[in-house]
Amino acid sequence: AHPLVRALWQPRLLEALDWIAAETTERLAAGHRIVWMEEKGELAVQGVVLSGKPDRIDRAPDGTLTIIDYKTGKAPGPKQVAGGYAQQLGLIGLMAEGGAFEGVEGRAACFEYWSLARDQKTDGFGCIVSPVDPSGARGRIRTEDFVETAARNLEAALNRWLLG
């Protein structure tokens, strides 16, 4: 990389990586376990193979799964997700619940984007945002409905463009 680019971005990148390390350490201390990272999985849906490579899947102390996607910039907004245009986390949840990732079992109950962008609240780099909400507040999909919603959207797309 150009020396100027390196000088401008390296401190930001290092701060963001330190943030990820601190967040991960805190979660591990609270009983979470990383159960899957950066490996491809596959799930057949209506005869079509859905493949995906989640950035990370954690198992919470209660046995549920947390689907994590790292973002170098801004994460998709709730309107994009609710509108069906950003379903990655829900589809990875569907795949995890369907056995696409060997040894990963459980219900996907938490969906997070870990953004390396500047956090407006702390002015530091790194923040966790969820595109869903437990109660469906602020126009978001209810957390417990996200996997089912993503599955319905996938099936509708398959029927419209591939199978129909």
Regions found by a protein language model. Name each.
Residues 1-164:
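Structural signature of nuclease core domains in nucleic-acid processing machines
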